[in-house]
Amino acid sequence: DVLGSRGLGDVYKRQGKKPCLSLRELEKQVNTDLDMLVNIVDGQMTVCELVDRYLKTKTGVRQSTKQGYVTMQRLLAKESFGKKTIRSVKTSDAKLFLIKLQQEDGKSYSSIHTIRGVLRPAFQMAVDDDILVKNPFGFQLAGVLVNDAVTREAISKDQMRKFLKFVHDDVVYCKYYEVVYILFHTGMRISEFCGLTLKDIDLENRTVNIDHQLQRTSDMRYIIETTKTDAGTRVLPITEDVAQMFQAIIEDRNAPKVEKSIDGYRGFLFYDDNGMPLVAMHWQHRFNHMVGRYNDIYRVQMPNITPHVCRHTYCSNMAKSGMNPKTLQYLMGHSDISVTMNVYTHIGFDDAEEELKRMEEFRKAQAEVEQKKEKPMSQKMFKVV
């Protein structure tokens, strides 16, 4: 039989199934697994079944990633493409499905990129298992979809200065000034900032310990997760002005009488009216309101500024100032130096022009110094023969 000589009991022991299912539930589960195994043998597995099987191999993923998988499975379950057998899916079918998602369903490029990011390895698994000969999703998205993704650009130093001044002077938003300043001058991820506790901030030695982040799931559960990458776990040195901002936040901290523990962490910097720590979404909304208010007042509009734009801007400013790339990589918590150099650093014409002017001024100054070192030649230096 398809299970071999070991039998169903051995299969369930190997898979770690708990013996707490009712007989009817166990029978249903066995039938489901048998159907899937038979489908593998005769090649009639559907796209939905393939994705479900692939996702079972993805263990140890973050909560946010799991939520994305559930969304993906729900989407496929509603699509006729999800009911197609995997052997019937051609490359043109795969392309047309993604085009439909963008042109008919209005899905964004980034969303479709994420969907393809599950379908391609799922079909590759079928190829590796000798069920398929070719991966129908083994093509590049360029030329198939219109890339409408909005690049999160860093803002200029002048824009940063104007926005900080506006927040500082505004009677409503001045209470957020310290947070905006810190994000612009440390490059912290907003989830890292939200996860900071009093124990993580050492004002005496001017360091901030970053080894976790605070998240809120779609079902409104608050969880602590490790940093995005191993490199994200770091001790961040801070300048005197940033230390003063943290000092002000700590002094004005309005914590509930009984601070709720989130996965063993308490002592967060900001709380909402329900006594729960603020998360990334709260700050995203506040940034939206601040930018909206600024653009209502001033004729020259401010581009969209988010906590992540603050991170881009910090990285860009540090790169333009001449900071060593490896140092910048550490401060940003990037696992790959190419991310630091290629994604977060935004060098444009104005920056190139300014750099050339600096080099020209340096060469002129160097030439003047060398000219002063040379003694002028006079007639007295020659002997009359």
Question: What kind of feature is each model-predicted range?
Answer:
Residues K18-P19, I40-G43, D52-I131, A149, ...:
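N-terminal core-binding DNA-recognition domain of tyrosine site-specific recombinases/integrases
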Residues H113, D128, L132-L196, E204, ...:
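Basic, Lys/Arg- and aromatic-enriched nucleic-acid-binding interface segment
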Residues D105, K165-Y176, T186, L236, ...:
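Short, basic (Lys/Arg/His-rich) helix/loop patches that form interaction surfaces
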Residues N205, S218, I223-T233, E240-V242, ...:
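C-terminal secondary-structure termini that scaffold catalytic or DNA-interacting sites
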Residues D200-T207, M323-T345:
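Short, polar N-cap/turn motifs at the start of nucleic acid-interacting alpha helices
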